[in-house]
Amino acid sequence: MAGGEAGVTLGQPHLSRQDLATLDVTKLTPLSHEVISRQATINIGTIGHVAHGKSTVVKAISGVHTVRFKNELERNITIKLGYANAKIYKLDDPSCPRPECYRSCGSSTPDEFPTDIPGTKGNFKLVRHVSFVDCPGHDILMATMLNGAAVMDAALLLIAGNESCPQPQTSEHLAAIEIMKLKHILILQNKIDLVKESQAKEQYEQILAFVQGTVAEGAPIIPISAQLKYNIEVVCEYIVKKIPVPPRDFTSEPRLIVIRSFDVNKPGCEVDDLKGGVAGGSILKGVLKVGQEIEVRPGIVSKDSEGKLMCKPIFSKIVSLFAEHNDLQYAAPGGLIGVGTKIDPTLCRADRMVGQVLGAVGALPEIFTELEISYFLLRRLLGVRTEGDKKAAKVQKLSKNEVLMVNIGSLSTGGRVSAVKADLGKIVLTNPVCTEVGEKIALSRRVEKHWRLIGWGQIRRGVTIKPTVDDD
């Protein structure tokens, strides 16, 4: 990235310039042109029964395959969330009928381009830049959403038109949305090309009946075919009109939860050419800037001679920021942001930094080794296919000394229940975590060889450890 040092983005001349010298954080909004030209500011989760076409819809809107990783199944449920960004445009010719005047493209598309619709004039202009968070499974989606590893502003609920509604998992997804208190939902009736019109109408009635009395009541139901890209422009229009622009905090000290990290150096690279590690995540609040000094907590975790946990935060500097292929000078909340640092690349290799929190030096929360939580358990297990009409298994109460998986932010760690009474519990964590009182956590238990979400909790207080810092 030549010339980026001076605080001005020079890459991609077709996108809006970002200049650190003239940046006034107090004037930024999630629709500021110089922000949405290069990065997404609204996060939309995609939810739906397996094989109902979530990734296909995301691909139809954004042109991006949210790639899946082979090792995903092997490692507990460390999830790779698939993120895909899309720009949504509106044609500035008032004579063009809706929904044809809406269009979506990938995130590196210019902010304006001439119309190609016969009989219209003018340009398509950028109105929104959204990020789709595509989760493989719903208990994972819930854990992710519950933890707040990504701020979710809205959800697309996918229902396949060629199956009856509701499928067993679909009702759980609604439960997930209820727990998450997501207000803004669009229901997409997918695979409409595979059914007769009468069947589609019948299913539409089923969907209406199904969402009655839930958070999704009154949500628009849009018939689409993701494969044939049919009605995708209607989805774009509804995203613009029905999903309000979320209030965002640009002025606090920045904080980013790391959900991916990697070493971008090729093997055999000359020492002088080595690049620092890259961390990827969604900014929760504040604005990160190129050149800024940062701290990563808990940092490097080790044990002292007595077996006590020690944490040594990592201090570094941001050398580059990017969203998908777009260079940034500063990054705001929303979408997945890559942060190029001067951290030793071996510390970032193969997702080693996942679960850490990155932010301004001295402004990050405490590091906890034990948590006291107030918790809620689900009445029944989610996501377990039951035979016939049998109800899903009941969730048993927490018992002392059992080991649960605790998801805090993007960190999945083991936790031993050391005490439990009524709706309060104490958990001793296997790995220290940087978090604060009031944060939500998700609890999972091993049921028939799988981790299953059994409930969620909120941190009341805990045991913290002081980070060790070198004297130099």
UniProtKB/Swiss-Prot annotation:
Chief location category: cytoplasm
Region of interest (Interacts with Cdc123), residue spans: 457-469
GO cellular component, as recorded: cytoplasm; cytosol; eukaryotic translation initiation factor 2 complex; synapse
Sequence positions bearing Phosphoserine: 16
GO BP annotation list: cytoplasmic translational initiation; formation of translation preinitiation complex; translational initiation
Disulfide bond residue pairs: none
EC numbers on record: 3.6.5.3
Region spans: G2: 76-80
Region (G3): 134-137
Keywords, alphabetical: Acetylation, Cytoplasm, GTP-binding, Hydrolase, Initiation factor, Nucleotide-binding, Phosphoprotein, Protein biosynthesis
Region (G4): 190-193
Modified residues (N-acetylalanine): 2
Catalysed transformations (reactions): GTP + H2O = GDP + phosphate + H(+)
Location relative to the cell: Cytoplasm, Cytosol
Superkingdom of the source species: Eukaryota
Residues binding GTP, per UniProt: 51-56, 190-193, 225-227
Tissue: Widely expressed.
Family: Belongs to the TRAFAC class translation factor GTPase superfamily. Classic translation factor GTPase family. EIF2G subfamily.
UniProt function note: Member of the eIF2 complex that functions in the early steps of protein synthesis by forming a ternary complex with GTP and initiator tRNA. This complex binds to a 40S ribosomal subunit, followed by mRNA binding to form the 43S pre-initiation complex (43S PIC). Junction of the 60S ribosomal subunit to form the 80S initiation complex is preceded by hydrolysis of the GTP bound to eIF2 and release of an eIF2-GDP binary complex. In order for eIF2 to recycle and catalyze another round of initiation, the GDP bound to eIF2 must exchange with GTP by way of a reaction catalyzed by eIF-2B.
Self-association state and partner proteins as the record states: Eukaryotic translation initiation factor 2 eIF2 is a heterotrimeric complex composed of an alpha (EIF2S1), a beta (EIF2S2) and a gamma (EIF2S3) chain. eIF2 is member of the 43S pre-initiation complex (43S PIC). Interacts (via C-terminus) with CDC123; the interaction is direct.
Other known facts: Has a homolog on chromosome X (Eif2s3x).
Protein name: Eukaryotic translation initiation factor 2 subunit 3, X-linked
Species: Rattus norvegicus
Gene it is expressed from: Eif2s3
